[in-house]
Structures are given as C-alpha cells and as structure tokens.
Amino acid sequence: MVSPAQIAGHVFDPDDPGKRFVVELLIDGVPVGIARANLRNADLLRDEPNYRDGDFCHGFVFSIDPATHGVARQIEVRLANRGDVLAPPLLAPALDSGLAPLGGSANRDGAVRWLGGLRFNGWLAPAAGDESRIRALVDGQIVAEALASHWVQFGDCGETTRARGFDLSLPDHFADGRARQAQILDDHERELPGSPCAFVAFEDGLARFIDKHASLQRQTPRAKLFDRRAPQSLPFSMFAQWRDRFPDARLPPQDAPPPKVAVALIGERGIEASVASLEAQEVCDWVAAVLEGGGGETAFHNESLREFLDGDAKDCELVAFAPCGAVFQPTALAQLARALSRFPAAPGVYGDFTLAGEGGEWPVALSAFGYERMLEQGAGALLFALPTPVARAAVAGGAENLFRLFNFSQDGRPAPKAGPSSAPAATPVHQPGFLARLPRLDVAAATRALTEANRAHFSARRIRVEMAPGSGALFPAVRVRRPAPRGKVSVLIPTRDRVDLLEPCLEALFATADLALHEVIVLDNDSTDPETLAYFARLVQSGVRVIRVGGPFNFAKIINKGASIAVGHYLLLLNNDVEALEAGWLDEMLGRIAEPDVGAVGATLLWPGGVVQHGGVVLGPSFAAGHAFNERIDGDPGYADLLCATHEVSAVTAACLLTNRRLFLELGGFDSVHFPVNFNDVDYCLKLRAKGLRIVQSVHAKLLHRESASRGLDRRADQKDRFARELDHLRAIWGAVLCADPYYNPALSLDDFPFSALAWPPRPLQARQNVSPPPRPMPPGF
C-alpha cells in the first residue's frame, strides 16, 4: 500500500507463519528506516492464498518524509541484512505528493531541504517581507535562526517567480553522528514544505570518523562517496570557529630550511602589525622594507624597490609582496617558499587571505591561476612572492605597482595571431590556505593601478585593447575589451515546436547583433505545430537556414548535425529559450576567444526574475557539476567580486557557448552516447581543458534564459534515469577533476551552492598549478 505519507505492507514465510521478519526502507539505494513486521494485518492476509494458521501479525508501516517527494528517484523495501526485495521499486513520482523539488513550480508556500552536514536552505512564499526569519527546532527546542537574505528563482516552463531565499546552519554540537530531524518554521510559525528534515553530521565528516574506528575501515570508500554526495559546510560568518578547528597545516619536515625571504610592504598604514606578524614567523628567515610614494596600498616608487633588491634583499632568493598592514600567519612565508620549491619553473606564487571587516575576518579563497581574472580584478596580486630574478626583471621593466609586478611574467603569452599551437606562458602557483589578513583596499585607487598595469602588459604583448573601470565592491575592476576577430559565426539553435520561445529568441538575436556576415541555423527536432512550421517558412525566406534533425530528443546529436553543415569559423550554441538583452554581447564573446589559448566562452544568464541562472560551472558540488551564483540577483558582486570580473572556469553551459568550429569537430563534437542531454557541454569543455585551452566565463555578456522552458525539467521516471546515467558517466570519465576543480578552492564547500560556505573539513590545501587531467577511458557498455 502506498500513499504520499506512508508505505505499508506485509511479509511472511508460508512454511513458518510464526516467524517475524525485519524490513528496511531504502531511498535511492540508501537505507533510511527499519521496522519489525509484526503489525496485525488480517484483512489483507486473508486474501493471501499461501497464508494459513497464523496470527495475522506480519505487517509493517513506514512514514515518508515530505522532503523525499520530488527529490528521490526510487523507493523500495527489502528484508534487512539479506537484500531480498519485497516488491518492484517504486518511482517517487508514484507517491503523487503534489510537492516539487527546489526549483520546481509547486512549492509556492516555500520549501526547505537538507544540503548535507548541518546546513539547510530553501525559500519563503513570494509575499514574505525583507526581514523574514527562519527558525530551526530540534526536539521541540529552537536551535538556530536565519534571515531570508538572498534571492532564488523557482518554477519552470516559462512560469517563474522570484522569492526570498535562506541559508541556515545548526550548532556544531549536533555533528555527533546521530540521525535527527529538524523542523523549519517561518516567522508565522508555519512549517515549510519539506520539513521536518532528516539530517546527520559528523565532527570531521564520515570518512574521518570511520578512520578512527578500525572495525569500520573497510567502509572507507563508501564513506568518502557519502562525504562527496552530502558534504558538510560552515557559513563564512563562522570563519573564526572554522580556523580554530582547522588551523593552517603545519609545515612538513624537510632536510633543508626554506630560503631567506625579502618582504616588500606597500603603503604607509599598519606597519606595526605587519612587523609583529613577521617577527612571529616560524622556520623562515626574512628581511623587510616599506615601499611608499605611489599612493594607496598597491603603488610604489620603482626606484625604492630597486634599492631594496640591490641592498638588504640582495642575498634573498624570493621576494614577497603585500599591502602594508598585512598580518601574516606564522607559516606564511615558509609556505610560499616551499610552494615555489615544488614548482621551480613557476614565475611566482600567490596565496589566499582574509579581509578585515567590522564583522571579523572574511575569507577570500582564490582559484588556481586564471589570466582573465588577473586582468579584470588583479586576482593573486595582493599577496604573492616572486623569485628574485623575476622581481628584478619586472623592476627593470618599470613596474610601479603590485599588479604590474604580478602580471609581468605573462608578457610572453602568444599574441592572438600566433595560433593555438604556440607555447603557453608559465603560470604562477596557487597556495590555498589563508596566509594573511589584509586591510581593505581603496578600490578606486587600486582600479587605476590595475588599469596602468594592464596597459603596460598589453603594450608588451603588442595587443590593442580598450579598458574601462568596472564596479568592484571589494577589489579593483577593469573591463578589458579586445577587438572581435574576423570570421563567420554559425549560430545553432535547436528547437521542437515552441514558436512562442523561438520567435523572441531570434528577434532579440537580430536586434542586438550584426549578423550580416554570419549565419543562423535553426535545428528542427520533429516539430509538428502548424504555427511553428509556418514560422519556419518565413525564416527560410528571410535567409535563416532551417535544418530538420529527426528522432528522439538528443541534444548532443542535434548540435553535432548543425556543426557538420555549418560554414562558420566559430559556432555559437544558443538555446531557443535564451534572449539577448543588449547590443555588444557577441563582440564581447568574440573578443575573448581571440586569444589563441581560449577554447570556449560562456555568457552570464539570468532568469526572468533577475536572479542569476548561470555564472559558470563549478565541478564537485555533490560529486557532480553545478551552476555558480544561482542564489544571487543581477547586480550582486558575487563572492569575492566574481560577478564583477570576467574569469575562467572549468566549463560553461551550452545554452550560450561560443567555440571554434574546427576544434569542435576535431574533438568529435558532443558525446551523444554518454551525454545525449545532460553534461555534454561539461564533457566538451573538459576535453578542451585537457588540451591546455582555457574556458572563459564573461560577466559582460548577459542574456535572459527561461531554463528548460522548451523541453521541461527532467521529472519523468525515464528522464530521471537518463540524468542519473549521464551523471554516472560524468563521474566515471571525469571523476579526478570533479574531486579537484582548479577554479574552485579546497577550502570552499561542495554542496549545491558553490562559493557560499566553507568546507567542513577542507580538502587538502596543497600548492597547485592550473592543470586539468585527461579523461578516463571507459569501455563500451560500462
């Protein structure tokens, strides 16, 4: 018997009616409940032809958590400890609960779900006020509160709503390995759909818990998978507690101590705090100087640095740079030095840091090196170290601020006309871990300094660019415009019927981009709607190519067909539910792909309600791939100003993706076997990355995306099975990079909302360069 709230049944042995069985309930293969089948169930058992001479006490009942509805794929009941399935698995939609998962259209009274560990998130009804609060109760006691402080978008198929979202974490004393339930209430004492939520958390994750118990260590691989699927996290506001629990790693013993480090502090304020922290350095010898005269925290007189390098620092192998007022962690200099010793050919090393603020310290966890973010934000240039020969060369080249010192090593990058075969420039090393607390910047002064540094850098590369100040909140922001390269663009737009989407998509495309030299190809996947077919006829008369691609919906196959008949130098993949918002977006994307080492460019996509739908793809959340900044509204600077600066990512969505057609065909296009609908774009981008090419996410190309309005979300049983199968393929082929995205920091959480919390515990904070592993070959049929 099945209902939205319960699953009931009975189990007996015809040869031994007095025997009682224990059964367990599994959701998506994970045991979530256990019961003894001893309830009286006479009415049903009388109809069993094989039942006789018993007391009818063989029944069981399981209650179903409402949070399961719309999220679980299948539910089944088995004999405990034996694995015998009592009945065919139930598909969760058969429960007919009327609820939908986060992002669905049914939960208009709000929703909540457990993200893993002690973290929950969700939204309130759209009518909720700006100061609405959420409360969490465990065993009837209020244990946590949170303000609904950000935005989310829910709904699909063209009907979307913006609502207040919340993020809530329970106190850490609940991380004791015990399974519990939390009730989540709004400020009207109403329980949100999805509540109560079952949760379990461990002090340092399940894998570390098992490592402490010898009898359980055979379960370590499963525990690691659990930690990836249900990762634990801690809010940024609790950084002090996080650091106390996970202090920066002690330096491993080495035969030789690190070299003496010269430290150049830029500016005038806070020198006492900086010197005190240098005097507390462990292992590493140092000498320091304060460089003034340039104005602000990033500029200095060139001659003053030259004198320091020729004088007190002449015997140092390494020169570290930071704004005056930086407070270094005790092992900061040694960690920078040893990171460079691991990568002796690298031109420098930079580290993560915290920013001082009224609410304490706020962690800035950086990615591995990204050229675009260096240009538009100066990322890496506030806490870094250079080999002394590199520092001397930069000074000889006229460097007068931190940004020019840092970007000097990239002057040798190949010019756009050099072609993709040119050797790439060596890139700096990233040392994760928060090595220092930095003072807040004068953003306007830093933006001017970054502009000057970029001007010198592009002059050295002999590239003509235009630059304009951006609107950074914490860091400098400079928009860099490269000339759009010559070459035809083939715009590929798959569709099936839905003229209501396709027509505004094309109207916006023609209104915002000069397509006289380009071609537009509509890929028709078996449309039958008369209005759509009539529209196709009008498109053909206007010069648009309409190509029929028949058969079941296979996005990868459709795109591959379009690429095979396209004649453009570039391919622009564009969903039929995407609408351009303003002119210049295509030239922006073309300017980025002009660099010879760029393989693909993606745009920032917004839902109709103004919430960010796509800000790049992050690898690893829930051991999968997810969109960044889904909880941010347009105009929000994003974590560490990432929505203010174009930057690199491991992948971008094919809803709006620009790539070189020759590259696309060389790599075999999209994989239509393993990724017919989902993750084909991620797989393609990772193949580009494995070739040493960069994937750029532009914040200056913004388009509207009515996500899945055309084909709908994957909710049917067959669609969910397909999604699960494609996700299994992604994990099998690209598991190594899913565990270590170079554009994501090991100190950040891996739950479903990237850049929103700290990982508990952090992943290994090892020095790294920006490399991507090759795919793992997978035999057919696996």
Pin down the residues of each PLM region.
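Non-catalytic membrane-proximal stalk/linker segments that position and tether the catalytic domains
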Residues: 91-107, 193-261, 266, 274, ...
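Short, acidic, metal-binding catalytic loop of nucleotide-sugar glycosyltransferases
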Residues: 255-257, 275-285, 342, 507-517
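Glycine-rich, basic loop-to-helix element that forms the pyrophosphate-binding segment
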Residues: 297-312, 549-566
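Short aromatic/hydrophobic "clamp" motif used to bind/position activated sugar donors
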Residues: 319, 571
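Conserved donor NDP-sugar-binding/catalytic core segment of glycosyltransferases
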Residues: 331-363, 426, 578-623
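A recurrent flexible, glycine/aromatic-enriched loop bordering the glycosyltransferase active site
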Residues: 362-391, 556-557, 564, 620-662
